[in-house]
Structure formats: C-alpha cells, structure tokens
Amino acid sequence: MKIFIDTANVEEIRKASELGVLSGVTTNPSLIAKEGRDLKEVVEEICNIVDGPISAEVISLEYEKMIEEGRELSKLHKNIVIKIPMCEEGLKAVSVLSKEGIKTNVTLIFSSMQALLAARAGATYVSPFLGRLDDIGNPGIEVVEQIADMFKIHEIKTEIIAASVRTPMHVLEAAMAGSHIATIPYKVIIQMSKHALTDIGIEKFMKDYEKAFGENK
C-alpha cells in the first residue's frame, strides 16, 4: 500500500518527503484555507517537493465550473489529480475530464455504491472516509473492504485512497482491507514510526556503547 500525506502544509510535506516514504499528496479547500495561501501557489510548491500524484480540489459544485477549474488546475503540473466531490454534478465532470486524459480523485465517498459510480464515470481514484464513517457508527474499514472486493471481482482499475485517517490503526486496517493507498496526516505518519520498545532499545544501545567506549566516542 502506498502512502500519501494529507495536508497543504509545505513544511510537513517536506519533512515527510525526507523520510522517503511518500508517493503522493492530497489537499482540500479546508487544508488550503488553513494555510492562508493561494491554491495554485501552494500546489505548485508541493509539486516541486513530491514527484507523485498531487490531488487539488475544485471549489465549485456546478458541473461546467468544475470542468473549467479542473482543466485550469491540470495545467499547473503533469502530476496534478483533480479532486471532485461525490455528487451528480461531480460524476458528470469526472466523465468529461477523464475522457480528456485528466486524472481525477472522487472524494467524500461513504458507500461502496458511490465508489462504483465514481469508478464507472472514469475516476482514477476514489477516497472513502474512514474516520467520518466511524463517527456515525458505521465502521469505515468495512466500506473499504467492500470497495476493494468489488473492484477486484469486476477488474476495476480505479485505485482506493483510504482517507479521513486518524490513527496508525486506521492505516493498518486500510492496508489489510486492500486499499491501494492511505492518505495520512503528518502527525499520524510520525506516530507510525514510534514504539515504546524501540525507544527503550535505542536507549539501551547508547548506554551499552557509552559504558564500553566512553561518552562521545
């Protein structure tokens, strides 16, 4: 399973990229607004850091404007993926853009049927939201499993991006459920690298080394 980072914070993206684990980036209007910067400016800077799919979301909910925004965003860089919300207007836009060779990521997926429609419309990616489904008592991972099974049975090439990831356990569950990608906040990526026994082991190695060879050797 590939790892994307879910943020518009360029510093977080740069730090995660230095770990050598990133395959792409997802952003959304809320994340861009949080940074207080121009969308195109942020996206272009991200493209210079990560050589992989960069999802940039349209703002409009009207079919024609979605297409217009998508075309403009796609001109920024070859790695741009147009992120479009799951709705009737969005499906129409995905169909048009995909036929033009523009990659799309249908977001705000909360059911396997939504994922099927998005895939058949031509979406490159679908993004089911784990955390938000969990919030309403509907285990998000079950939806990911359904989508993964359905895509496999029917040989659908659309890739699954597990989104609304809040914990390392969400990442593990997504990987085991068959998600192709998990898009993860920076803090969760860092949490994934930690373990109490690792810290204890490192501390012991350092103490043993200092005992044998002296400090700062």
Curated annotation (Swiss-Prot):
Entry keyword set: Cytoplasm, Pentose shunt, Schiff base, Transferase
Catalytic site: 83 (schiff-base intermediate with substrate)
Gene3D superfamilies for this protein: Aldolase class I (3.20.20.70)
Subcellular location: Cytoplasm
Statement: the UniProt record of this protein carries the keyword Repressor: no
Disulfides per UniProt: none
Keyword check for Cytoplasm: yes
Its job: Transaldolase is important for the balance of metabolites in the pentose-phosphate pathway.
Protein name according to UniProt: Probable transaldolase
